[in-house]
């Protein structure tokens, strides 16, 4: 059976008016490297091997902030959650009220990001926190025979 995984390149359409704040946030707060800077598009490297392009568009061609909050979030991993949380808050982003212990916020341009620790156990989000295993396209029951809670 063919296998599929997410790649390490992403792109987001964002309002052209947010270009300076996007550059400042991703470069100065998150520590990204701007690989290529342009009028219509910027390419950033985040960490060792993740690339994200920001495609600068007119307002009517992009999601507004409420659209992003209803769509998808990206996860940011850091080796110092407390320090990064302070830097993000000091920049002045919109913090979202999500029933989860992690920081969810909207970065400049509207993207929703979740901040977690690099070594944090995230098995509760993977459906594997109660001992079940993903085998051949289906979850198996725990070794003790109980079905995991939903």
Predicted regions and their residues:
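Conserved short beta-strand elements that form part of the metal-binding/catalytic scaffold
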Residues: 33-68, 112-123
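Short, flexible helix/strand-to-coil boundary loops that buttress conserved ligand/catalytic motifs
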Residues: 26, 88, 126
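A general structural signal for short secondary-structure boundary/capping elements
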Residues: 54-61, 92, 103-104, 116-125, ...
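Vicinal oxygen chelate
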Residues: 14-20, 69-112, 117-120
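N-terminal beta-strand motif that seeds the catalytic metal site of vicinal oxygen chelate
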Residues: 1-23, 71-74, 121-150
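Short secondary-structure transition/capping segments
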Residues: 46-48, 106-110, 126, 130
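Conserved positions at the start
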Residues: 7, 41, 100-102
């Amino acid at each position: 059976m063919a296998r599929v995984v997410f790649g390490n390149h992403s792109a987001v359409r964002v309002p052209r008016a947010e270009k300076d704040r996007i550059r400042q946030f991703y470069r100065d707060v998150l520590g990204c490297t701007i690989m290529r800077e342009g009028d219509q598009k910027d390419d950033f490297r985040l960490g060792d091997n993740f690339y994200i392009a920001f495609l600068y568009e007119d307002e009517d061609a992009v999601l507004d902030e409420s659209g992003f909050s209803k769509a998808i979030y990206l996860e940011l991993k850091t080796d110092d959650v407390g320090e990064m949380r302070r830097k993000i808050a000091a920049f002045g982003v919109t913090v979202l009220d999500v029933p989860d212990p992690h920081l969810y916020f909207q970065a400049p341009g509207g993207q929703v990001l979740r901040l977690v620790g690099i070594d944090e156990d995230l098995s509760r989000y993977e459906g594997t926190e109660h001992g079940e295993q993903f085998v051949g396209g289906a979850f198996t029951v725990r070794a003790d025979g109980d079905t995991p809670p939903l």
